[in-house]
Curated annotation (Swiss-Prot):
GO molecular function, one term: nucleotide binding
Annotated function: Replicates viral genomic DNA in the late phase of lytic infection, producing long concatemeric DNA. The replication complex is composed of six viral proteins: the DNA polymerase, processivity factor, primase, primase-associated factor, helicase, and ssDNA-binding protein.
SMART domains in UniProt: POLBc
Protein name as it appears in the record: DNA polymerase catalytic subunit
PANTHER family with a match to the protein in the record: DNA POLYMERASE CATALYTIC SUBUNIT, DNA POLYMERASE DELTA CATALYTIC SUBUNIT
GO CC terms in record: host cell nucleus
InterPro entries for this protein: DNA-dir_DNA_pol_B, DNA-dir_DNA_pol_B_CS, DNA-dir_DNA_pol_B_exonuc, DNA-dir_DNA_pol_B_multi_dom, DNA/RNA_pol_sf, DNA_pol_B_thumb, DNA_pol_palm_dom_sf, DNA_pol_type-B
Catalysed reactions, semicolon-separated: DNA(n) + a 2'-deoxyribonucleoside 5'-triphosphate = DNA(n+1) + diphosphate
Species, as recorded: Epstein-Barr virus (strain AG876) (HHV-4)
GO biological process, one term: viral DNA genome replication
UniProt-listed Enzyme Commission number(s): 2.7.7.7
């Protein structure tokens, strides 16, 4: 749109344009709209509702009471608005992606069907199912009546439980405002905690308001000494587990009553029903066409990096890339919301707004009225979402939750951890928005990739082969103030970022993975990424126990005592120039739980030995000496472990899914099956951690300690067994006498490291081909000889050479030629490129050159002092040559200035630093003295180290720090010795395993044998 067609009604008001509503709006309008290039904003207040310009037309952003705003009206004009529901109750098939828990009070009786009113007097839980109708894909909200919230209590003899519950409610200020219906009944249940518990009488306490559960449970426990069970189970989980429903999938409702007025949601269709009307269609794993949105914002930083609470730091543009999950990846609808005029962008719908307030309303209503279910972005949890919500709330007093999918009671918030201020991009922030599945692709990429950094450009290059056009935030004010053409360039960059993020979503198919985890774990999709693994296992255990009439007690302080975690077989550090075979226990901790039938329900604790009466040691139960004494676990034929049963059923299901996957040819179905098996794998691996987290939902550290104890024992037994095998024993493992050529009779196996579930076996005297030949047979033979199913050892990989530094830190070359690094940072990421590249050359030489490898092996098996008395092996001299050449390059100025640069972020104003004795601050002060342009907060300040004036030895780093551009322009010599020392320190860290695993010793050797030419 050209600049001449756009006018700002708040700078040039047209009073006859619109009828004025009663509400007054604050608008912050950039001054550059009046005066090109001007900075700052104009504060305008007026009654005009939010407005938008699109294709030369002015439209009101908002809508009527039914929420039909500009996006809805646009759909109606295009013929894509959905039909209304029938006016009578009829069967309904629909897909659910989110489940919400709400509460109705008796005031709602006037707007709900008469047969549902009894559920909400004086108040009652209403479960809302959000999803899509099967018939036409319309968005739906189904209000489900009849679900209860409840918990269990074991009461002392003679206690009137119902009276105690009513007393608790009367003591609650909350209940005086919202009266709660109470039901107490005696039921027969068994506690899951401990073997030998008999079925007994428990009180099931049902409350019509879920917020009363915690208060009443605490009251009964503290005031009356009751033992409380399952008070931490919310109504949503009760709804799913009590009725065997799913959290993501197809439902059928035999009688769905349309709600045509007084709706709770902004969904296209809304219905009322009862729990008993619903059933699940598990056989159908297909998806409807859900709407995914990737967004990005561009902000104006008046005083450096944008700050949401600064009025002038406006959001200038919001890019919105929409994709329907039923479409091919890449078929996106691209939308740009922008302040002011903007030239056309090919393939992008450009909507222009007179102020930030108008644009924010349009953004929130886009999510609502275009029925968005999945929202993604890149680092949006830490920046974009907090920025948008802070602007909306604190600058404009907008309640974003009121513009969401639910008219009342919705949530729209960002939960920042307590340490969020310690590092940009490093805090685990949670976004909770009613009716949306938030997926931050930054967090996904950090979890699934191993890269030097996780900037969007780096990730896009690595995964998509795409180059991201970047605009520095310093350029944004200039581009925006430049007018329509500048905003076009800024908009192209903004839209490009959102499109790349949507490409990443499709690359990982993370939305399908989230849905599959939600289904197996019985939790809503929006809780999968942010709520950790505890809730997944807890819900599954709850479901399994419920089927057998067991109940779960609330954790007590005694459940949270500490225990000794997993240990390792200490590494024999050094360089190994012979094959190193790595064998792994497949799913070690889950297999231990299965093999030893470990569970809350199979455990007999110290002092409870009378429960062993009639049981035979070794045959009916196993005993383990732990920190707190001797614990016993009965075997499967006595009572099957719930945890083991869950694992067995999951693994059997995973095996069946993988079989289907192998035969499946439909790409979409293959994706779903693959994510299903991955979801099962993730959940299985979480079971051990669930028992071992002291502040978790249901900790039992004695189970976790038993698992780690068995893990240690298994490693030690496997080590002794493997080291006792001779070449003849290995030869006997051949499938037939003539299958293998004779093995080296001088060969020897030695375990050089054991890491939780892995053994590193040095195959001394055996060739690489011989090692590969017997690897699988060795693992299988050890499994058969030592362990019971399902515990299994597998040959995972073989190194042709290995640098073993310390536990969980090693570098080696695999037999396929690839280099594998674990826990090793060649040099610090903050090191300059000069140090990084030279250190990499040293490592590559040690791992690849045959003579250097022989020398490295010799060095690692002798005391480092011998290097001073006997000299270095000749084969190691090429390493010294690399270091000497690096020194020469420094001395003769052949190292580009760019390779010598360091950089540090200016995290706050200079006056806010307690100490300014830091290199980057020294350079900042030089900028001030030279009257040069100053870096802004969050800018990275580059610096190099130069020779101190007068060649003073021992000068501080702050005295040596200089601006790289200034140093290059004026020919200031760099601090050669300083950089060379940095290089030697980096090389010593890599080579320390050659010198008694001591980086100080390695540094002294390198300093002794490198030749610094005299000045």
């Amino acid at each position: 749109m050209s600049g001449g067609l756009f006018y700002n009604p708040f700078l040039r008001p047209n009073k006859g344009l619109l009828k004025k509503p009663d509400k007054e709006y604050l608008r912050l309008i950039p001054k550059c709209f009046q005066t090109p290039g001007a900075a700052g904003v104009v504060d305008v207040r007026g009654p005009q509702p939010p407005l938008c310009f699109y294709q030369d037309s002015l439209t009101v952003v908002g809508g009527d009471e039914d929420g039909k705003g500009m996006w809805w009206r646009q759909r109606a004009q295009e013929g894509t608005a959905r039909p209304e529901a029938d006016t009578h109750g009829s069967p309904l098939d629909f897909h659910v992606y989110d489940i919400l828990e709400t509460v109705y009070t008796h005031e709602k009786c006037a707007v709900i069907p008469s047969d549902k009113q009894g559920y909400v007097v004086p108040c009652g839980i209403v479960i809302k199912l959000l999803g899509r109708r099967k018939a036409d894909g319309a968005s739906v909200c189904v209000n489900v009546f009849g679900q209860q919230a409840y918990f269990y209590a074991s009461a002392p003899q003679g206690l009137d439980v119902e009276f105690a519950v009513l007393s608790a409610l009367k003591a609650s200020t909350f209940d005086r405002r919202t009266p709660c219906r109470v039901s107490v009944e005696k039921v027969t249940r068994r506690s899951i905690m401990g073997y030998g518990n008999h079925a007994g009488d428990y009180h099931k306490i049902t409350l019509s308001h879920p917020n009363s559960v915690c208060h009443v449970a605490t009251w009964l426990q503290d005031k009356h000494g009751c033992r409380i069970f399952e008070a931490n189970v919310d109504a949503t989980r009760r709804f799913v587990l009590d009725n065997d429903f799913v959290t993501f999938g197809w439902y059928s409702c035999r009688r769905a009553i349309p709600r045509l007025q007084h709706r709770d949601s902004y969904a296209e269709l809304e219905y009322d029903c009862e729990v008993g009307d619903l059933s699940v269609r598990r056989e159908d794993s297909s998806w409807p066409s859900y709407q995914a949105l990737a967004f990005d914002i561009e902000c104006l930083g008046e005083e450096g990096f944008p700050t949401a609470t600064n009025e002038a730091d406006l959001i200038l543009q919001i890019s919105c890339v929409l994709w329907s999950t039923g479409e091919e990846a890449g078929r996106y609808r691209r939308i740009l919301l922008t302040l002011g005029t903007c030239e056309d962008i090919e393939g992008v719908e450009v909507y222009e707004f007179p102020s930030e307030l108008d644009m924010l309303y349009a953004f929130f209503q886009l999510i609502r009225d275009l029925s968005v279910e999945i929202v993604t972005g890149y680092n949006v949890a830490n920046f974009d979402w907090p920025y948008i919500l802070d602007r909306a709330r604190h600058i404009y007093s907008i309640n974003p939750a009121s513009l969401g999918k639910i008219r009342a009671g919705g949530v729209c918030e960002v939960r920042r951890p307590h340490d969020a201020g310690k590092g940009f991009l490093r805090a685990n922030t949670k976004v909770r928005i009613t009716g949306l599945i938030p997926i931050d692709m930054y967090a996904v990429c950090r979890d699934k990739l191993s890269l030097s950094d996780y900037k969007l450009d780096t990730v896009a290059r690595h995964l998509l082969g795409a180059k991201k056009e970047d605009v520095h935030y310093k350029e944004i004010p200039r581009l925006f103030a430049a007018g329509p053409e500048g905003r076009r360039r800024l908009g192209m960059y903004c839209v490009q970022d959102s499109a790349l993020v949507m490409d990443l979503l499709n690359h990982f198919v993370i939305h399908v993975e989230v849905a599959e985890i939600a289904k197996i774990a019985h939790i809503p999709c929006r809780r999968v990424l942010d709520d950790g693994q505890q809730i997944r296992v807890f819900s599954c255990l709850l479901a399994a126990a419920q089927k057998e009439n067991f109940i779960l007690p609330m954790p007590s302080a005694s459940d949270r005592d500490g225990y000794q975690g997993a240990t390792v077989i200490q590494p024999l550090s050094g360089f190994y120039n012979s094959p190193v075979l790595v064998v792994d226990f497949a799913s070690l901790y889950p297999s231990i739980i299965q093999a030893h039938n470990l569970c809350y329900s199979t455990m007999i604790t110290p002092g409870e030995e009378h429960r062993l009466a009639g049981l035979r040691p070794g045959e009916d139960y196993e005993s383990f000496r732990l920190t707190g004494g001797v614990y016993h676990f009965v075997k499967k034929h006595v009572h099957e472990s719930f945890l083991a049963s869950l694992l067995t059923s999951w693994l059997a299901k995973r095996k069946a899914i993988k079989k289907l996957l192998a035969a499946c040819e439909d790409p979409r179905q293959r994706t779903i099956l693959d994510k299903q098996q991955l979801a099962i794998k993730c959940t299985c691996n979480a079971v051990y951690g669930f028992t071992g987290v002291a502040n978790g939902l249901f900790p039992c550290l004695s189970i976790a300690e038993t698992v780690t104890l068995q893990g240690r024992t298994m490693l030690e037994r496997a080590k002794a067994f493997v080291e006792a095998l001779s070449p003849a024993n290995l030869q006997a493992l051949a499938p037939s006498p003539d299958a293998w050529a004779p093995l080296n009779p001088e060969g020897q196996l030695r375990v050089i490291y054991g890491d939780t579930d892995s053994l590193f076996i040095e195959c001394r005297g055996f060739s690489e081909s011989e090692t590969l030949r017997f690897a699988e047979a060795l693992a299988a033979h050890t499994t058969r000889s030592l362990f019971v199913a399902p515990i299994s050892l597998e040959a995972e990989k073989t190194f042709s050479c290995l640098m073993l530094i310390t536990k969980k830190r090693y570098v080696g070359v695999l037999t396929d030629g690839k280099t594998l690094m674990k826990g090793v940072e060649l040099v610090r990421k903050t090191a300059c490129k000069f140090v990084q590249t030279r250190c990499r050359r040293v490592l590559d030489l040690v791992l690849a050159d045959a003579r250097v490898k022989e020398a490295a092996s010799l060095l690692s098996h002798r005391p480092f002092q011998e290097s001073f008395t006997q000299g270095l092996p000749v084969g190691f001299l090429p390493v010294i040559d690399i270091l000497n050449q690096a020194y020469t390059d420094l001395r003769e100025g052949r190292v580009p200035m760019g390779e010598l640069c360091f950089s540090t972020e200016l995290s706050r104003k200079l006056s806010a630093y307690k100490s300014t004795q830091m290199p980057h601050l020294a350079v900042y002060q030089k900028f001030v003295e030279r009257n040069e342009e100053l870096p802004q907060i969050h800018d990275r300040i580059q610096y190099v180290f130069v020779e101190p004036k007068g060649g003073v030895k021992g000068a501080r780093k702050t005295e040596m720090a200089e601006d790289p551009a200034y140093a290059e322009r004026h020919g200031v010599p760099v601090a050669v010795d300083h950089y060379f020392d940095k290089l030697l320190q980096g090389a010593a860290n890599i080579l320390q395993c050659l010198f008694d695993n001591n980086s100080g010793a390695a540094l002294s050797v390198l300093q002794n044998f490198t030749a610094r030419p005299p000045f």
